[in-house]
Amino acid sequence: MINRFSIEKVKGLEIIDSRGNPTIRVFVRTNDGVESFGDAPAGASKGTREAIEVRDENGLTVKRAVDIANYIIDPALHGIDVREQGIIDKILIDIDSTENKSKLGGNTIIATSIAALKTSSKALGLEVFKYIAGPRLPKIPIPLLNIINGGLHAGNKLKIQEFIILPIKFNTFKEAFFAAIEVYRNLKGLISERYGKIYTAVGDEGGFSPPLEETREALDLIYTSINNAGYQGKIYMGMDAAASDFYDPKKEKYIIDGKELNPTQLLEFYLDLAKEYPIVYLEDPFEENSFDMFGELQNKLNSTIVTGDDLYTTNIKYLKIGIEKRSTKGVIVKPNQVGTISETFEFTNLARRNSIKLVTSHRSGETEDNFIAEFAVGIESDFIKTGAPARGERTSKYNKLLEIENKFGLEYGGKYFYL
């Protein structure tokens, strides 16, 4: 008897992401004709320990990744029960046989892994978030909205990569999200008034890139916008420093705001900012090997969630180091960094067991697929990072969260969040 859940076909397709770059979409179809897909996102700022993408012609195509899906992965997964996520991912890992997924490509593998999960949930007639959550009743995560861009995400002189708002003190996700939109609109008007309308054009993640030179200029703009919108004490602030990008390893200095700072001086810089602004979130404040400096900052900023992205790259090996050194209270969760859904689950489960906050994140190169929103709800992520409330590939995620809240009545995580 044919198993209706068995995989009948795996097929790759070259598509484009939100930056116009090629990426891979993988379809997985069962014997019963149930089919879904997974898209591989791509980052601009990447940790050196991330899974390696397979690309051709200086990154201009992913034809080889498509061929890998069609001619290597397809026969390898043929006949496998699509509900067996662990088995599917192990097959992919074993065929690849490299630590950084460079043989099959992290992009090919994660697209296949996502496609299998989505096809399985569809075959069982379940929403993706319900399939992941199981019997648990999850909450809607608090959004981290990147509304001013710097670093590799912008063309200005700001070194900090993302300036973020966190709408926390609200009863529902809808209330929180639309309050954040008010701040975003207020900021747009402020930038237009001070720097000209041309600087209200949005970047890769929907944030603005005004001609600013120093960190406090950006923080002042956002703080003013929060106050003007009337949300002081309800909407807080955060930053993704992406400090590896402004670290000079030869000098062992951080080049920021026209100064060269050693690690201790940079730590003091962050402490001063936390005194001046309602900053409750600080991501990648030091370069990606500085577990001890992360821990020292977290110890001194107890009410701020210091978070590791490049520090961990969603890899359990590095998370164990961070746990041992008590480096952070938060971890970024990006499935494409490690390559499979199963490995991502291992990472999030270990973080949860150690009371570390989960921050599920998009990448700067995204597609219109809203999988990451459902994934964030399913794992009961504390936060979700998916850009500003602009650009279709960002708003598709927010709209999915609004839909889930409206349809299933899930509670908002901010309602129970204490700083």
Swiss-Prot record:
InterPro entries xrefs: Enolase, Enolase-like_C_sf, Enolase-like_N, Enolase_C, Enolase_CS, Enolase_N
Cofactor: Mg(2+)
Signal peptide as annotated in the record: none
Entry binding sites for Mg(2+): D240, E283, D309
Keywords from the UniProt entry: Cytoplasm, Glycolysis, Lyase, Magnesium, Metal-binding, Secreted
GO biological process: glycolytic process
EC id: 4.2.1.11
Disulfide bonds: none
Protein name (database record): Enolase
Organism encoding this protein: Saccharolobus islandicus (strain Y.G.57.14 / Yellowstone #1) (Sulfolobus islandicus)
Gene field: eno
